[in-house]
Amino acid sequence: MTQRVERNYLEITSVKDLKENNLLTLNCSITLLEPENFQINKFFYKIVGKKHNWTDRLSWSESQWIQYSSDEKVKTYILKVEEDLAGYYELIFYNEKSEVEIAYLGLVENYHNQKLGSYLLSSAIKNSFTNNITKRVWVHTCSLDHKNALNNYLKRGMKIFKKEVIEI
């Protein structure tokens, strides 16, 4: 049985276009995961993606996770509330194209509906532009993602540049 899924591709071409959300009442921090730790990437991929049909990496071997997470193009950032792991994002830097892909971004379910998604996305966009090479940050989201995902991208200043319908 196939399912019809709407996919939107969005981009932002200047950090000046970011409509940032950095007003939080929770004690939280976002930090670059150093050193790389494939177990953290795998943990978030599974726990965040479970409700949103993220399946492409479920069959990855440990060596595939290690290879991916240790790739110099990939940067993983972790959101903590107090000391709890609350969310993450993965950025892939394509310096030869002067662009960054927000490959994955999401929150652990306990931290939904607290404005943390907009805070996390604001951080992802800002960190994408810190290298003075990036001219474009892009992401894709689909109708299986969190119900507020597309609206969050649009509210942060991203623009849709492509739409498609796929069958999965």
Predicted features and spans:
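Acyl-donor-binding surface of acyltransferase catalytic domains
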Residues: 1-29, 34
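A conserved beta-strand-loop-helix scaffold within acyl/acetyltransferase catalytic domains
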Residues: 60, 69-76, 80-99, 103-106
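Short acidic/polar active-site loop segments enriched in Thr and Asp
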Residues: 75, 135, 159
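Conserved acetyl-CoA-binding loop-helix of GNAT-fold acetyltransferases
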Residues: 104-107, 113-128, 151-155
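Conserved GNAT acetyl-CoA-binding A-motif
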Residues: 129-141
